[in-house]
Amino acid sequence: MPRRVLQGQVISAKSDKTIIVSVERRFKHPVYHKTVKIAKKYAVHDPDNLYNQGDKVKIIESRPISKTKCWHVIEDKGQ
C-alpha cells in the first residue's frame, strides 16, 4: 500500500522535535451540494526543529514514532 502524502500549514512548533500541521480538505456535501472545508491536525516528526509556525510543508506517512506521531516532513513549500 502506498504511503499517503499530504500538504498543510504548520500551526504549532512549540514541542521539541514535533510540529502540528493542519491539512485542509474540501468536498461537496452529498445532500446539500455545498462545498465544505474540513481541517485535520497531524503531529509530525521534525528531528532538527527546522520549521516554524506559518510554514507550508509536505508530509508523508511513516512508521509510528510515538502514540500520536506517524508522519515525517519531506518538503518545505515556503511561506
UniProtKB/Swiss-Prot annotation:
One Pfam family from the UniProt entry? Ribosomal_S17
Signal peptide segment: none
The chain's coiled-coil residues are none
Q: Which UniProt key words apply to this protein? A: Ribonucleoprotein, Ribosomal protein, RNA-binding, rRNA-binding
Q: Which domain of life is it from?
A: Bacteria
GO CC annotations? cytosolic small ribosomal subunit
Would you kindly state one Gene Ontology biological process term found in this protein's UniProt entry? Answer: translation
A Gene Ontology molecular function term for this protein is: rRNA binding
The text of the family note is: Belongs to the universal ribosomal protein uS17 family.
Per the entry, what this protein does is:
One of the primary rRNA binding proteins, it binds specifically to the 5'-end of 16S ribosomal RNA.
How does the record describe its quaternary structure?
Part of the 30S ribosomal subunit.
Sorted alphabetically, which HAMAP family does this protein's record hold?
A: Ribosomal_uS17_B (MF_01345_B)
Its recorded name reads: Small ribosomal subunit protein uS17
From the broadest rank down, the organism's phylogenetic lineage runs: Bacteria, Pseudomonadati, Pseudomonadota, Alphaproteobacteria, Rickettsiales
- Provide the gene name from the record: rpsQ
